[in-house]
Amino acid sequence: MILSRRTFLKGSAAGLAGAAMISDLAAHLASAVPAARVRVGARQGCFGGTFEAAKRCGLDGVEIGVGGPAEKLHIADPAVREKFKKDVQATGVVVSSLSMDLLNGNPMPTDPQAPAWLEQTIDAAKDLGAVGILVPFFGKAHLLAGKEFKKPETDALVERMKAAAPKAKDGGVSLGIECTLSARQYLELLDRIGSDAVGAYYDIGNSAGAGLDVPADIRDLKGRLTMLHFKDGGNYLGEGKVKMEPIGEALKAIDYKGWIVLETSCPSKNAEADGKRNTDFVKKLMGLSA
């Protein structure tokens, strides 16, 4: 089972009182959104960007980028995080996750700075109360050559994720590997890493576009999913090529209770209106109150 911040807190000696280990803000956020249901978040470009807009859309959380390559990441700056904390406190919308998009051009397995960036991001996630980190592998960072893993890169990735996993677990943060992989490939990789702090960040749009059986993958990845990205090219959810109802059924079948993060487009060019439309669709799909 993938580690969640709520699981981390419940495992402490005094429940939420033990949240002092991860900061007062994290304690507040751990109880801000019920863990007994799916939560809906979005990347900043999918709804208008501000936490106020996210609240108007009915979102529970926002996925935030960590910034571009630098010795010290943007998100590692306490002043940057303080602004996000104020946004959270003002709106009740939490930081669901941090996205390390810079790793697509500076791959986790090979870039000498990548382990330090991951450590900085874990510290930032812990401070912000974010439960997950997106560790992506696209473009030159993709883990596959054809249908097979790139052996040197994958071997290096396994070692680096093994090294980072204890810090993530101690902070109550899950590391989500996002790459267009089948469930079988994900499980092979995750079994090699061997930590419940590392799981699959599954993108339904990318996977459907690659011809994968998304509902079957979701069922096979029960207990190994950190989060999911929902998108369908340039379409509103439910109106494109991705068949959403079987995906919703699969998530219910595995009793998924984590985050669904929108990575949707804006067909009308009104980001907030489109963000609300897609949020409402996901809530209806998953049987959540609007």
Language-model-detected regions and their locations in the chain:
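Charged helix-capping and loop-helix junction motifs
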Residues: 76-81, 111-118, 150-161, 213-217, ...
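N-terminal small/glycine-rich loop or linker at the start of catalytic domains
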Residues: 34, 38, 96-105, 140
